[in-house]
């Protein structure tokens, strides 16, 4: 369901067509990009400098979109889903995720802001998130949980205006 932070809710295809620069028919299923990466990436491809002082969270993946390399994220991705009228939906509890998630390399942790309901997945081996390995990797749960919960606390009041 798209109303969750499971891969089915946040993973989506991204299709780029730019005949003068991108060879048709290329597929990249390995690189992990996010919407915040689009601004610096598209500016770079278009030869446009980002505005002076720009400090967005996105990374420039121009070489990935141009088919010249695979991407390895330099920063973790974090999500917060739950500050709107759709939280607690869908009605099927099995489709509901905790409201925070962090992706760090192949690891993805879902957790609530109070530290409850931690679920850890190795996305490279388990892209459908069927095998929660949180019990086997408490150190990763602790590290990523602390990071995403701190991020949430620092940002939870932003975007309400």
Name each model-derived stretch.
Residues 102, 141-144:
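Hydrophobic packing residues in well-ordered alpha-helices of helical domains and bundles
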Residues 41, 129-132:
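A general alpha-helix detector
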Residues 137, 144-148:
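Short amphipathic alpha-helical coiled-coil/interface segments
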Residues 126:
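Intrinsically disordered, low-complexity polar regions and short flexible loop motifs
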Residues 2-5, 22-31, 36-123, 154-160:
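C-terminal cap/loop subdomain of S1 sulfatases and analogous C-terminal strand-loop tails that border
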Residues 131-139:
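Active-site-proximal N-terminal segment of extracellular/periplasmic enzymes that hydrolyze or transfer
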Residues 1-21:
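Histidine-centered active-site microenvironments of extracellular/periplasmic hydrolases
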């Amino acid at each position: 369901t798209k109303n969750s932070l499971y891969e089915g809710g946040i993973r989506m295809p991204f299709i780029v067509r730019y005949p003068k620069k991108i060879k048709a028919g290329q597929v990249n299923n390995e690189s992990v990009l996010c919407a915040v990466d689009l601004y610096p990436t598209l500016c770079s491809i278009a030869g446009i400098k980002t505005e002076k002082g720009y400090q967005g969270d996105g990374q420039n993946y121009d070489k990935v979109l141009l088919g010249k390399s695979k991407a390895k994220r330099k920063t973790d991705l974090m999500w917060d889903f739950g500050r709107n009228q759709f939280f607690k939906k869908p009605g099927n509890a099995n489709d509901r995720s905790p409201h925070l998630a962090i992706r760090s390399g192949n690891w993805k942790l879902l957790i609530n802001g109070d530290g409850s309901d931690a679920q850890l997945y190795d996305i490279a081996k388990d892209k459908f998130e069927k095998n929660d390995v949180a019990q086997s990797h408490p150190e990763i749960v602790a590290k990523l949980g602390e990071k995403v919960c701190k991020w949430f606390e620092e940002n939870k009041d932003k975007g309400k205006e």
